[in-house]
């Protein structure tokens, strides 16, 4: 949804906003193969409500466009939120969730529970990782000079004017299997304090950057 409002003969206000869900509506039955043994397994993956990654599902923008005597200025403030990371299906396999619960019982000071009643998984156990959103301000200033033949145009564009480098642009969850081992009897051993599942890989916005452009029209 967007709108453009003419404030004066030389100044316009622009707004834009969108919200999306883009999520799975059910769990799935998965078939996968372990590369180290080439064995094929079947399991249930609890991926319901997992959302599309790599793009903000909530966006908003407000901007001012000014045009006076050959000058133009565009100032835009853009808001991004609900940025989900690419989820790991294997982290949500029923067998893995069961092993994670066993790891919690064996080492409750390290691993969180995946079920409280033995009937359903906790929200945190299957929650999708998210990235930090926020505001980004962009500025463009230009001047057009008419010549006898054609015109000369100057344009300075600055992206991320406020140097906000906390906005996540994407990333992915990391597998949790290296946090512990499970022997043939189902006993959890060799726990590790560092959990990859709690430390997803994230990518962040570039800092302030810009470009100066000169063009000639004829």
Describe each model-derived feature in a short phrase:
Residues 1-89:
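Gram-negative outer-membrane beta-barrel transporters
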Residues 34-45, 112-123, 189-195:
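Flexible, solvent-exposed coil segments and beta strand-coil junctions
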């Amino acid at each position: 949804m967007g709108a453009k409002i003419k404030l004066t003969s030389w100044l316009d206000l622009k707004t834009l906003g969108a919200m999306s869900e883009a999520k799975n509506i059910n769990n799935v039955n998965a078939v996968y193969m372990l590369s180290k043994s080439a064995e094929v397994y079947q399991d249930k993956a609890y991926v319901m409500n997992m959302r599309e990654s790599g793009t903000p599902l909530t966006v908003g923008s407000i901007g001012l466009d000014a045009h006076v005597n050959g000058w133009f200025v565009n100032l835009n403030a853009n808001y991004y939120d609900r940025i989900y990371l690419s989820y790991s299906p294997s982290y949500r396999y029923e067998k893995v969730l069961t092993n994670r619960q066993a790891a919690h019982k064996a080492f409750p000071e390290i691993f969180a529970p995946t079920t409280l009643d033995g009937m359903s998984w906790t929200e945190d156990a299957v929650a999708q990782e998210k990235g930090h959103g926020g505001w980004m301000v962009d500025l463009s200033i230009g001047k057009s000079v008419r010549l006898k033949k054609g015109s000369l145009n100057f344009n300075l564009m600055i992206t991320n004017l406020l140097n906000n480098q906390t906005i996540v642009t994407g990333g992915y969850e990391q597998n949790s299997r290296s946090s512990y081992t499970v022997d043939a009897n189902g006993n959890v051993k060799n726990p590790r304090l560092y959990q990859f599942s709690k430390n997803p890989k994230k990518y962040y916005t570039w800092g302030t950057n810009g470009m100066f452009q000169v063009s000639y029209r004829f």
